[in-house]
Amino acid sequence: MSSASPRDIARTVEGRANDYANDYAELHCRSQFSFLHGASSPERLVEVAGQLGLSALALTDRHGFYGVVRFAQAARDTGVRTVFGAEISCGNGDIVVIADGPSGYVALSQALTDGQLRGSKSQPIFDVESLAQRVSGECFVLTGAHEGPL
């Protein structure tokens, strides 16, 4: 059994990561528009995703589509495909809702607006049942968020 230095291991892992990177898409990523939850600009997120060789990146800011225009513009000329979604606080925790195409974007936009109108500034109120009705068949829901129900 031969020994390897940490640098050799890092090079090997890095090489393998690059082999498989195109098969991976990050589906839960918050930008600086998610106050106290995200730090990087949408442009920087796209830049790093490209450096890592990700095939796609979902921008899922809390309770809104705040960074999607800048995100889409930054990704336009890169190989990184964009996915739009939002992290939503409702019921027993946070869920991530990802739009399935343009009709999903519209449905999720309406659901986000509903929650914002039900609550107050910076305190939206999302009802699980009405959210489910709004996005049913138009979006994917991930329940394993950091503070999610699973």
Task: Enumerate the predicted regions with their spans.
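Phosphodiester-processing cores and adjacent nucleic acid-binding clamps
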Residues: M1-L150
